[in-house]
Amino acid sequence: RTEAEKLQKQRERITADAVQTLKSKKGVCQGYSSLFYEVCDQLGIPAKMIPGASKSMLTHIGKLPEDEDHVWNKIYINDKWELVDVTWAAGIITGEKPKFEFRFNPAYFCTPAELFAYTHFATAEAERETGMTAREFADLPLYYGSYLLANFDLETPITAFLKPRANDILLRLNFLPE
């Protein structure tokens, strides 16, 4: 197949995912991201779908991001590319028996790359805006969506693995300007 045929097939898959998500009112990241991509396309907003690894569970700490388990978007607005995760913005998984709970989080729209990189690691190196390595990503603590809305930044430690000295652990927080 030619490159044009491959791109056409990929485009058809994205459209099919978007339509299915809209019709069923259900979806996972592929469907959400495809639907957002299609909406952007219809509005004339340049958009991309970015596959990669996510960090959303405690078991992800220390694990290298080798498997693609998530997809999100980049959109070009106001003369720059912005990161968007419509799936994580829509809600969270809760409970012993995993269930999706709608809980809108606007922090996943046009998220600064430095914050986005705490939980998202693009497969394509060209899409990693911070230059973070796979090992650095793996060693990060687990950041929840509420952290993105907080008015502070964790200055130290920058890894999830803490080694206490004399039974003390020092945490430094920077409170951000309002």
Segments from the language model and where they lie:
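Alpha-helical and coiled-coil interaction segments, frequently adjacent to or embedded
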Residues: 93-178
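Hydrophobic/aromatic-rich core segments of domains that either
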Residues: 31-114
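Secondary-structure boundary elements
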Residues: 1-28, 32-38, 43
